[in-house]
């Protein structure tokens, strides 16, 4: 599993306030961490950031639990001593042992088979393992970070995830919120990613017209920050973003008044959508009197 090595200190701190303190505490106390969030919210980056800040001498070893077939998962995780089973022609180290002195990152742990969860729990509790086919115990010095895309609470209730393993991992949970719940971050992040993409590609950055702003703010962003970053790169390259052509006349008309109008319209639309068109709730969130909100809805043709 490949992890992006690029860090953005400001962005990481926005996603997890006091990240440096959290990482140092994890290293000193030897506790395991659970990262919870939808795809694209930055779990992989935060895991690598925690490892880097922690100062552990070993490396970060990442295993995507959803990408390994169930038949191979046990030997991949715990290692194997030849000949533990047919086809095991040589001994090899598993993911856990490879992280000795460093950090083990179990991505999408909500996809781990139940049969493997019990064995992982034992390793987490004893900080020791036995390779498949061996009775020798290997003591471990490993920090464990796990991530889940779906709610482990729900998985436990559905019988898909062990309750005891969940409690073991849930000592410290870092929740990474989806982008759609933070509309105020969309435009600043888009512009930040545009600047980074322009520098990487050695091209000029691009303008963000009112139409594109409205589209960006109205999009659900199911891929979260990862999707937003890709959209910013496409825009810098001159490709359409969410159906908006950067070469269109409407896109090139970027007056301040029209930009503010587009932003206001998008923010009101998003608030109404979040609150199922409840004017009272939207008025409270937007800090706008009900009468003013009704008037702006009419004027902006929402």
UniProtKB/Swiss-Prot annotation:
Domain Sigma-54 factor interaction span(s) in chain numbering: 9-237
Query: InterPro entries, alphabetically?
Result: AAA+_ATPase (IPR003593), Homeodomain-like_sf (IPR009057), HTH_Fis (IPR002197), P-loop_NTPase (IPR027417), Sigma_54_int (IPR002078), Sigma_54_int_dom_ATP-bd_1 (IPR025662), Sigma_54_int_dom_ATP-bd_2 (IPR025943), Sigma_54_int_dom_CS (IPR025944)
**What highest taxon heads this organism's lineage?**
Bacteria
UniProt keyword terms in alphabetical order: Activator, ATP-binding, DNA-binding, Hypersensitive response elicitation, Nucleotide-binding, Transcription, Transcription regulation, Two-component regulatory system
DNA-binding region location: 279-298
The record ties this protein, via SUPFAM superfamilies, to: Homeodomain-like (SSF46689), P-loop containing nucleoside triphosphate hydrolases (SSF52540)
Q: Name one GO biological process term.
A: symbiont-mediated perturbation of host programmed cell death
> One GO molecular function term?
ATP hydrolysis activity
Can you tell me which residues bind ATP? 37-44, 99-108
A Pfam match is HTH_8
Q: Which PANTHER family does UniProt cross-reference here?
A: C4-DICARBOXYLATE TRANSPORT TRANSCRIPTIONAL REGULATORY PROTEIN DCTD, TRANSCRIPTIONAL REGULATORY PROTEIN
Q: What does this protein do?
A: Member of the two-component regulatory system HrpR/HrpS that regulates the activation of the sigma factor hrpL which itself induces the expression of hprD as well as other hrp loci which are involved in plant pathogenicity, hrmA and avr genes. Probably interacts with sigma-54.
Q: What is this protein called?
A: Pathogenicity locus probable regulatory protein HrpS
Organism in which the protein naturally occurs: Pseudomonas savastanoi pv. phaseolicola
- Output the lineage of the source organism: Bacteria, Pseudomonadati, Pseudomonadota, Gammaproteobacteria, Pseudomonadales
């Amino acid at each position: 599993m490949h992890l992006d090595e690029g860090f953005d200190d400001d962005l990481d701190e926005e996603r997890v306030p006091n990240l440096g303190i959290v990482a140092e505490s994890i290293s000193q106390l030897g506790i395991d961490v659970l990262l919870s969030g939808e795809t694209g919210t930055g779990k992989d980056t935060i895991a690598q950031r925690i490892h880097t800040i922690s100062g552990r001498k070993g490396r970060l070893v990442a295993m995507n639990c959803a990408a390994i077939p169930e038949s191979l998962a046990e030997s991949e995780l715990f290692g194997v001593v030849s000949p533990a089973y047919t086809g095991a022609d040589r001994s090899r180290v598993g993911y856990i042992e490879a992280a000795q002195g460093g950090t083990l990152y179990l991505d999408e742990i909500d996809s781990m088979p139940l049969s493997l969860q019990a064995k992982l729990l034992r390793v987490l509790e004893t900080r020791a393992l036995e390779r498949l086919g061996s009775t020798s115990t290997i003591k471990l010095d490993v920090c464990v970070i796990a991530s889940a895309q779906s709610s482990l609470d729900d998985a436990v209730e559905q019988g898909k995830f062990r309750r005891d393993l969940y409690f073991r991992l849930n000592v410290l949970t870092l929740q990474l919120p989806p982008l759609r719940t933070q509309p105020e971050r969309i435009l600043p992040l888009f512009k930040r990613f545009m600047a980074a993409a322009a520098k990487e590609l050695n091209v000029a950055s691009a303008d963000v017209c009112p139409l594109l702003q409205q589209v960006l703010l109205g999009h659900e962003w199911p891929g979260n920050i990862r999707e937003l970053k890709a959209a910013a790169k496409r825009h810098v390259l001159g490709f359409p973003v969410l159906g908006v052509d950067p070469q269109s006349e409407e896109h090139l008309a970027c007056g301040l008044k029209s930009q503010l109008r587009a932003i206001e319209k998008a923010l009101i639309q998003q608030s109404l959508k979040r609150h199922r068109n409840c004017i009272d709730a939207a008025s409270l969130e937007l800090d706008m009197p009900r009468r003013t909100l009704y008037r702006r809805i009419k004027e902006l043709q929402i």
